[in-house]
Amino acid sequence: MVLQDPKYSLDPVMPIGAQIAETLQAHRPCHAAQARRQVHDALAAVGIEDPARVMRLYPHEVSGGMGQRAMIAMMLIAGPELLIADEPTSALDVTVQLQVLGILDKLVADRGMGLIFISHDLRLVSSFCDRVLVMYAGRVVEEIAAVDLHNAQHPYTRGLLNCLPQLGAPRHPLPTLDRQPEWAA
């Protein structure tokens, strides 16, 4: 699982390489030299240009984008069939966000694994995902193809979509949802 902010997900007193190696050893024990090579390769696979240097750094010594790439490397080194990414780009600026999404997309496609992408950013979801499940009060209230998200029917989904800002459109107060108890049923 790739979490929202690497600053809170990575151990601050352990070098990044050691954290990734620990994950590898927990799932597929191997000799230390082999683990170092695999950690190096995992960091390179997520677009880190100098993996050997980054392996020695502590989380506070890297940028948010590099920390998130390290988190992705840590999650992928165990060879999962499914990756859960919970708001993996929300703590990143837009440029880095797109880079991280590109890395995730490539790795998921190359490895043939599934991805559950959790996000409140409906624009991002509609451009990055195949299918969308909209949840309200812990329950799925709508399932729709991402390309059809703009045609969603559930009042909660419509309310979320109506809150998205439109470039060039006049500003207006955000609509208030008239929440119904049956939405959560």
Give each language-model segment a name.
Residues 119-120:
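H-loop/switch region of ABC-family ATPase nucleotide-binding domains
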Residues 20, 72, 83, 96, ...:
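Hydrophobic anchor residue at the start of the ABC signature
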Residues 49-55, 143-185:
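Short catalytic/signature loops enriched in Gly
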Residues 125-127:
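A short, surface-exposed alpha-helical micro-motif characterized by mixed small hydrophobic
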Residues 77-81:
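A short, proline-enriched helix->beta-strand linker immediately N-terminal to the Walker B motif
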Residues 98-111, 123:
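Helical segment within the ABC ATPase nucleotide-binding domain
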